[in-house]
């Protein structure tokens, strides 16, 4: 069975401080989709943000501390898509797709309202 988990972290650095990655290590997920990372990848230097055994992909917002998505995948995807040619979605890092043979998984952050 293929196990996918999705989670809105409301800030991946704050989630890390609250034990998110310790929790994640127990979940045995094949793919983890994360929304609202609220960080630039250059800020994610600690190894905690790149869990062992996962290929990690981040799609950050142009605006610091806002929106953004990520995907952690046990198997290396054939393709990673971060752009839809839709300015508001692309500039805020709201879409991240990973493609595997016969399956695509999308981490999508859509605001309420």
Identify the function of each model-found stretch:
Residues 1-51, 61, 66-67:
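N-terminal, active-site-proximal structural segment of metallo-dependent hydrolase catalytic domains
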Residues 37-38, 45-113:
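Structured beta-strand-rich core segments of catalytic domains in phosphoester-bond hydrolases
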